[in-house]
């Protein structure tokens, strides 16, 4: 892989992730999942242990978006992209905040690793792994951590 193609691929991946961020802010589940492969496997921070397929990931996004009153503040911080021949991975710290329909406000950070494959000339997310650290003394998630 040449430096030029690596730079081009990294820019294409960054563009797809920027679109995912914009769609999440707009609570548009269809657009937010348009970068996912049809056979994506997602390990989310909430039940169940995995979501298999883009339809399951889209349904999860719709369910999450429906908990907000208005737009979601959403960002990726410390995004790192590593590109190889036909495969790539990213990792970032993700932040979401917004007013909840049930009352109160969500304001949390979590870790995300994405595995991408280049299929038919297009980068798609084949695997997503999101996680929240936990306190080993209490067994509870550490939701108040900030970078």
Show which residues each predicted segment covers.
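A beta-strand edge to alpha-helix "cap/lid" segment located at domain peripheries
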Residues: 2-34, 41-147
């Amino acid at each position: 892989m040449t430096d030029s193609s690596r730079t081009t691929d990294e820019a294409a991946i960054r563009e797809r992730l920027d679109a995912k961020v914009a769609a999440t802010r707009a609570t548009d589940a269809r657009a937010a999942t348009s970068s996912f492969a049809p056979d994506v496997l997602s390990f989310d921070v909430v039940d169940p242990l995995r979501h298999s397929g883009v339809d399951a990931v889209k349904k999860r996004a719709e369910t999450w978006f429906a908990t907000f009153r208005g737009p979601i503040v959403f960002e990726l911080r410390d995004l790192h992209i590593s590109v190889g021949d036909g495969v790539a991975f990213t990792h970032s710290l993700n932040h979401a905040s917004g007013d909840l329909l049930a009352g109160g406000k969500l304001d949390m950070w979590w870790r995300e690793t994405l595995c991408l494959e280049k299929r038919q000339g297009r980068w798609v997310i084949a695997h997503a792994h999101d996680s929240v650290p936990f306190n080993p003394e209490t067994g509870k998630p550490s939701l108040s951590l900030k970078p």
